[in-house]
Amino acid sequence: MIRIAIPNKGRLHEPTMSLFKDAGLPISGGAESRILFAKTTDPDIHILFARAADIPEYVQDGAADVGVTGMDLITERGADVEALLDLKYGKASLVLAVPEESVFQSARDLEGKKVATEFPEITRQYFKNLGITVEVITVSGACEMTPHVGIADAIVDISSSGTTLLINHLKAIDTVFSSTVHLIANKKSLKEKGKILDIKTALESVLNAKKKRYLMMNVPEASLQAVKEVLPGMSGPTVMKVESSRSSEESFLAVHSVVDADLIFTIVNKLKNVGARDILVVPIERIMP
């Protein structure tokens, strides 16, 4: 059996549930039912719902074989785990921030000052790398208020959009750490349970598919070479003969290709200009290596 720890609530919960569903491993239950354990469609893969901050230690200690959580939390806990895959969502930055009216303009201005944070280890390492001595004050919440009540001169805190800083009259003066959600594994489990890599491959196939689109079109046989020059494809386009019920009609080929999603606008217009018609653009659910 493989046990996967995923966030039980918060901004990482729903994207994680959706990713597993798209990968063919839908999870029963979730935050709404307040359950601790759940099953997937694979009888050998079970789910453990946990606080995102606790998942690195759960995986390190073997309570879970695999986990999904933010790289900021993994780094802060110093967890001895194997990072398998950047899942590309849950983007956030740990920023160094000071009051809007503060005279501090950079980290170096904080020499000998107090910095409050929920991420003391990352914060200490950041200032150590800069050769700056500060007093790090660990708080468990409401970090934004500490400069306004005299507890600290600055804070290091998570900022996804900057709105919370703005509301609390704070300004960011540096980025301390950039984070996304990662798939991690217990090192011993990774060696002993081959299915962990199957899980990684399934999730990765969904991430790869989101960046691609499937193109289908009809192409006059005389225009095939021009169309091939437009289509990059993953391993060249697929070309098939289109059967016509009328022998007098122009001969057509069906051309299929996988292309980068962000190139669709440009490619479709080029294809039309070289004679392609009946062009279909289709989302892809998964791309398996």
UniProtKB/Swiss-Prot annotation:
It is found in: Cytoplasm. Pathway: Amino-acid biosynthesis; L-histidine biosynthesis; L-histidine from 5-phospho-alpha-D-ribose 1-diphosphate: step 1/9. Belongs to the ATP phosphoribosyltransferase family. Long subfamily. GO terms for molecular function: ATP binding; ATP phosphoribosyltransferase activity; magnesium ion binding. CDD domains: PBP2_HisGL4. It is an enzyme of class 2 (transferase). InterPro entries: ATP-PRT_HisG_long (IPR020621), ATP_PRibTrfase_cat (IPR013820), ATP_PRibTrfase_CS (IPR018198), ATP_PRibTrfase_HisG (IPR001348), HisG_C (IPR013115), N-reg_PII-like_a/b (IPR011322), N-reg_PII/ATP_PRibTrfase_C (IPR015867). NCBIfam families: hisG, HisG_C-term. Keywords: Amino-acid biosynthesis, ATP-binding, Cytoplasm, Glycosyltransferase, Histidine biosynthesis, Magnesium, Metal-binding, Nucleotide-binding, Transferase. It holds the Pfam family HisG. Feedback inhibited by histidine. Gene3D superfamilies: 3.30.70.120, Periplasmic binding protein-like II. GO terms for cellular component: cytoplasm. Its EC number is 2.4.2.17. It comes from Methanosarcina acetivorans (strain ATCC 35395 / DSM 2834 / JCM 12185 / C2A). It catalyses: 1-(5-phospho-beta-D-ribosyl)-ATP + diphosphate = 5-phospho-alpha-D-ribose 1-diphosphate + ATP. Catalyzes the condensation of ATP and 5-phosphoribose 1-diphosphate to form N'-(5'-phosphoribosyl)-ATP (PR-ATP). Has a crucial role in the pathway because the rate of histidine biosynthesis seems to be controlled primarily by regulation of HisG enzymatic activity. This is ATP phosphoribosyltransferase. One of its GO terms (biological process) is L-histidine biosynthetic process. Its cofactor is Mg(2+).
